Amino acid sequence: MPDDGMKQAYRLARELLWDRLDDTSPGTTEILKQVHQADLIVVQGQYDHIESVLESAGMPYSVITTARLERAKLRPDQIVFINCPGLITSKTVRKLQQFVHQGGFLFTTDWALKHVLQPAFPGLVEYNQRPTADEVVRVEILDRQDGFLQSVLDAEDDPLWWLEASSYPIRILQPDKVKVLIRSKEIQERHGESPVFISFEYGQGVVYHMISHFYLQRAETRTLRQAAPSMSYVAAKGIGEQAQRKYQDLGAEEITTGQLESAFTSTVTLWGVVLRKKARDRDRKQE
């Protein structure tokens, strides 16, 4: 289970993201406010809980079981999130393949690499058969040119990512078709592959996959900066002194910069996927 510090970090990350967007990209907040419960479908899992990040971020969503997913009528304007382990039937695999081909977005984590992506989209990515230990690694965000990420992340951001024991490293089989959004040299050195977060186009839709679990249950500190109270991270994001009082009341002095930074990066990554989906649907309507 996540430690209390990470639960608090996710609550603070939501406030920080909205405050940062109000200053840098107010139009983005209006788009995000148009997300409806039926737009985001979370398939329950045993080991990951993406819905916890969605809830902390203030996103509306619907939760269904794998059995209900098999019967569900999916729309191409939706995003389907599949929590680890992603154990689904062959019928559901074909349903998801068709869903993405018609324009839907699919977001999976960890063991779903083997149980969902390999059978649904063969020949693109696979599990490299070298499971991880329970560890925290430094990650590098490669997609910083993305307009949304530019508006909320800074060059000083240096997030760490939690890997649960037996996470599945991602081997890319077709580098020309699979984009690495976040990578880790530490994972490559220890387990043979660097990708942390990837995406690829399929038909009119997009598939996203992340190693380990999206809801980070713990963090660690490696530098004095990361060990400092998270108020320093809040200030570095441009939050003024008067507005900082809100964060103090929310307990920002009780968690570290490392905890808030990891939760903020996780939250931002999720919002980025939702924004890309909204933008693509808007462009399709204008065609």
What residue ranges belong to the model's regions?
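Extracellular ligand-binding/catalytic regions of CAZymes and related secreted enzymes
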Residues: 1-38, 55, 205-206, 212-287
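Helical hinge/lid and interdomain linker segments adjacent to catalytic or ligand-binding clefts
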Residues: 36-120
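Short, solvent-exposed loop/turn segments at secondary-structure junctions
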Residues: 47-48, 87, 113-114, 186-187, ...
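A glycine-rich, often tryptophan-bearing local segment used as a flexible ligand/cofactor-contacting loop or short
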Residues: 87-159
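Hydrophobic/aromatic beta-strand patches that form the interior of the parallel beta-sheet core
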Residues: 107, 181, 208-210
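Conserved anion/nucleotide-ligand pocket segment
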Residues: 158-166, 180
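Short, Gly/Ser/Thr-enriched beta-strand-loop segments that form substrate-interacting elements
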Residues: 175-194
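Short, surface-exposed beta-strand/loop micro-motifs that present aromatic residues
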Residues: 192-203
